[in-house]
Amino acid sequence: MTAAHGGPLAGVRVVELASLAPAPFGCMVLADLGADVVRVDRPGAPGAGRLAAPTGGPLQRGRRVTTLDLKSPDGVAGLLSLVERADVLVEAYRPGVAERLGFGPQVCQERNPRLVYARMTGWGQDGPLAARAGHDIDYIAVAGALEPLGRAGERPYAPMNLLGDFGGGGMLLAVGVLAALLERERSGVGQVVDAAMVDGSALLTSFLHGLLGTGLWAAPRGRNMFDGGAPFYDTYRTSDDGFMAVGAMEPAFYAVLLAGLGLADDPDLPAQYDPSGWDELRRRFTERFAERTRDEWTAIFADLDACVAPVLGPGEAHQHPHNAARGTFVEVGGEIQPAPAPRFDRTPTAQPSPAPDPERDAVPVDTILTTWQ
């Protein structure tokens, strides 16, 4: 299999050491933007190893794949031969593991001073927790990103692994790689990128810290403007057990929301920005949304600028007319997946190629090197 390349990163060569979600997502972004990404898998039969580092699906698309035993001298030698011709190496081992195996930053950059050596971890390369195990929920907990999530009086809820693994992890890794590549154009040398999920998750709370600094986020969880405390920024159940999302924060949009709900002329409705009336507003909105199905409310608000939208599942989002018109989702290898983003007018990205099969599509290092002259 040969991955198709097109986009602003065409010609950039990336070596990715197979790992879990954050680094593969960051490398997917790089591949989507045109980079030639070669994933280095560990040898072994399918089973536990594949569960530990999935080899299919959207996160693995757009790559070529080779297999190396990085615990053997020959495997390390093969990796270093790739490093000599690569622009970027991405690894997600715990701190010190790559050094112990013989392909840490110093060794690799001695071979290739222009190499961007990107490291993806949960806690970062230093600090008291650097060597500690963890997952998304742990990183966002320590970063202060988990505590604000949840209803008033209830425990924080686990928001999938979108914030730590992907938003604060893989996406920030990709940003770091791009920044280092840009800086290399000025300095002529690469550098180490230390991308930590706890750092990225903390960065995602920048807006919240701004609210805290101005006193606009002072109430307990679930009583603030953006955490479901405000009835005009929340979700509501419909008669068919669907949901509608409401984000009518500004008075102009709020007025249209009330019109769509048939509440515009209700003299007893509390004022929008009076928190003492929010419970009553929520009760009224809840009752009204429960009168119709999700599709009926979607039709009612289709032509109203009220900041109201249906809550779609990942299996149906591609069917929404707006997403269909923009091509927000694409079919890759018979599977519906999010399309590459963002979009570029002069250097558009190519249709992603399916994830390579490690057994069928793996190619020797020497074959890759012939294409990296």
Residue ranges and their predicted role:
Residues 232-304, 308, 368-371:
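Aromatic-enriched alpha-helical interface/lid elements that frame and gate functional surfaces
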Residues 44, 123-124, 197-202, 240-242, ...:
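Glycine-rich beta-alpha junction loops
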Residues 157-168, 190-192, 223-227, 231-233, ...:
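A short glycine-threonine-serine/GTX helix/turn-capping micro-motif
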Residues 238-242, 294-295, 339-373:
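An anion-binding loop in the catalytic cleft
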Residues 47-56, 314-360:
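Active-site-adjacent capping/gating segments
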Residues 143, 169-190, 203, 207-214, ...:
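Oxidoreductase and adenylate-handling cofactor-binding alpha/beta cores
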Residues 37, 302-316, 373:
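Short, well-structured beta-strand/strand-turn elements
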Residues 1-189, 332, 353-373:
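N-terminal helix-loop segment corresponding to the beta1-alpha1 unit
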